Amino acid sequence: MPFSERRKYPRVPEAVTCQVSVGVERFQTLTQNLSCGGTLCSLSEEVAPMTKLEVVLDLPASLGAVRVPRQSVRCVGVVIRQDRLPLEDRPSYLTAIYFTDLKPEDRRRIGEFVLQSMFSHDRRRS
């Protein structure tokens, strides 16, 4: 049986500065990958699945040779899954976040960033 990708949006392996808030607790982190549908990042605390989070992504001002203005994207998401990273000195949890409330213009900004990143990665391979 052939493999079928279930993701609705393409994702890219980009480290984007990200602030995640759970109630009054805030975590500063970097994404490991990003799409219009969500992100994967590392958090220092365990967060239960389906916990609602506030996410602020600081999309970079440039990506390779492509120059774009720096943009912040704010949205709401939920934790889909979390896996403890085994070889860390301090607790660290790889956290998958699904964006549940994202303004259309912010989804477009992330989409443009993802496309530029994909283009940049393709150019590096050729």
For each feature predicted by the language model, list its residue ranges.
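N-terminal helix initiation/capping motif
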Residues: M1-L34, S42-E46, G111-S126
